[in-house]
Design a protein with these regions (language model features):
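Acidic-residue sensor for enzyme active/binding pockets
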Residues: 103, 111, 147
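Short glycine/serine- and small hydrophobic-enriched flexible loop segments
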Residues: 111-119
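Glycine-rich phosphate-binding loops that contact phosphosugars or nucleotide phosphates
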Residues: 2-108
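Conserved small/polar residues in nucleotide/adenosyl-binding loops
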Residues: 140-148
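A short, charged, Gly/Pro-tolerant segment at domain boundaries
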Residues: 119-139
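Charge-rich intrinsically disordered tails and low-complexity stretches
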Residues: 106, 110-111, 130-131
Length: 151
């Protein structure tokens, strides 16, 4: 979701990521974009319930179009992917752990939307690169060997 927010910002759209300190209040003119494989993620259910009371429209990207989040959504984009939480809902299987295939499918879907928006807005890669960060911090992951499980 964060990478999609960043791409939308690159397109020149006014975008905020829920939970960041610089995110302003929402209103009925805003669109909330939510991704949840199961459609039952409790923190998202809480956020979307409040957003709906404020008149915010929501687009949901999910595996389960009958979920709690789906019932609150203005629009649903169903993504076919296996999920250990939703084995009853489809016969799809993956050797990847947990919701990996949903997350990968979500990223590809978002990148496709970005390309379509670029076409609609008359933008190309060079134009949107001008909105890319030019001051970046170092991001890294630190894993301590003695804190890992030996397999």
């Amino acid at each position: 979701m964060k990478s999609f927010s960043m791409r939308l910002m690159h397109l020149g759209l006014k975008v905020f990521y829920i939970g960041e300190t610089n995110t302003p209040s929402v209103n009925h003119n805003d669109l909330l974009i939510v991704g949840s494989g199961s459609g039952e993620t409790l923190s998202l259910v809480s956020i979307t319930e409040k957003a709906k009371k404020l008149g915010v429209k929501m687009v949901l990207f999910t595996i389960d179009d009958l979920s709690t989040l789906a019932k609150q959504a203005s629009r649903i984009i169903k993504i076919s992917a296996p999920s250990p939480k939703l084995q009853k809902s489809n016969n799809l299987h993956s050797i990847q752990p947990m919701g990996s295939l949903f997350e990968q499918s979500l990223l590809i879907t978002f990148e496709t939307i970005v390309v379509l928006l670029m076409e609609r807005l008359g933008l190309d890669s060079e134009m949107i690169f001008k909105n890319h960060a030019n001051l970046e911090s170092v991001s890294y992951t630190h894993l301590r060997a003695h804190e890992t499980t030996n397999y």
